[in-house]
Amino acid sequence: MLTRRIIPCLDVTGGRVVKGVQFLELRDAGDPVEIAEAYDLQGADELTFLDITASSDGRDTMVDVVRHTAERVFMPLTVGGGIRVVEDIRRMLNAGADKVSINTAAVSRPEFVNEAAERFGSQCTVVAIDARQVPGEQRWEVYTHGGRKPTGIDAVEWAVRMESYGAGEILLTSMDRDGTKDGYDLALTRAVVDAVSIPVIASGGVGNLEHLYDGFTTAGASACLAASIFHFRQHTVQEAKQYLQGRGVPIRMV
């Protein structure tokens, strides 16, 4: 059985790591390079950087953050936020990223995902889906522009389409659960896991270690992404891995 991955997520704006609730109310959590080094030492399997402002002036800041991080850590880095054209991908990969995460640009121009996969490989091409449950229904709608813009697109159908366009992985965030510490949206995650054959990363809502376990077991995620519980030192990545290993989840120990 493939080992499951634990991925801390760093939301970056203005060169600082922040954490919010349902994409709002941001708190400063520190320097991204220092935090990345700490997670590397704790045995994180990967790290995800999301540039949550992603303005053109912020792009150079993010390239610097990625470059400085890649010089000092050994785990794979995924970078997302404002990836709009092939040149954005090239810059991030040249700075030391291993994968890029495409969100808004995929909705605006789905063939961009195909171009990215053909140029750089599916293994580099992650499609991020921010989804919110449709009130009173067992379906989820895709949102873009950092969760600000509803699209009318069904999240499960979108994941299937993105796989067909060459995405190698889906980063699936429940906007309803983001920062709430109430646990992943297991129904959303399971629906996408069952619909695609590529790995799905569960994101949004981890408040304790059992939530990670549920993400791997009940929802079937290949990887679990978390921020608050790690940033604010509720748990270390190592503690999370020891807990999961103790409950029978195949995990890479360091």
Curated annotation (Swiss-Prot):
InterPro entries in UniProt: Aldolase_TIM (IPR013785), His_biosynth (IPR006062), HisF (IPR004651), IGPS_HisA/HisF (IPR050064), RibuloseP-bd_barrel (IPR011060)
Stored SUPFAM superfamilies: Ribulose-phoshate binding barrel (SSF51366)
Substrates-to-products reaction catalysed: 5-[(5-phospho-1-deoxy-D-ribulos-1-ylimino)methylamino]-1-(5-phospho-beta-D-ribosyl)imidazole-4-carboxamide + L-glutamine = D-erythro-1-(imidazol-4-yl)glycerol 3-phosphate + 5-amino-1-(5-phospho-beta-D-ribosyl)imidazole-4-carboxamide + L-glutamate + H(+)
Gene: hisF
Record Gene3D superfamilies: Aldolase class I
HAMAP family, per database record: HisF (MF_01013)
Record protein name field: Imidazole glycerol phosphate synthase subunit HisF
Top enzyme category: lyase
CDD domains attached to this UniProt entry: HisF (cd04731)
The protein's Enzyme Commission number: 4.3.2.10
This protein's UniProt keywords: Amino-acid biosynthesis, Cytoplasm, Histidine biosynthesis, Lyase
Subcellular location as annotated: Cytoplasm
An example Gene Ontology biological process: L-histidine biosynthetic process
Protein family (similarity comment): Belongs to the HisA/HisF family.
